[in-house]
Amino acid sequence: MPNEVDDFNRFRAELNEEILNCGHLGIKRFFALDNQAYDPGPLDTRTKELLGLVASTVLRCDDCITYHLVRCGEVGWKRDEVIDALNVALVVGGSIAIPHVRRAFATMRGIQGLQPDVK
């Protein structure tokens, strides 16, 4: 059954393809730079995704938060680890980040490995 995360991923893939096919070199270069920033270096990709989630939350970018939550699930972060990172984002970002943390929790419901335990 499709969910909001599936819809987000489809929309993102479709629009990224359109953007990258528009022929603008600057846009292509920026997308490449953004992608390469998460390649392993002194920090591994897994850590960089968690940093991306924190930065996205502080900056209050819901699409970015969703993307990094999906990636955090893919690279093996556990729900409690992601919640701990969201706590850091909340402390850095302040109370204005609360609605974005709330949406992050809602989004995690649809991500394998980040879903709440059913009790």
Residue ranges and their predicted role:
Residues V91-I96:
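Glycine-rich phosphate/pyrophosphate-binding beta-alpha loops
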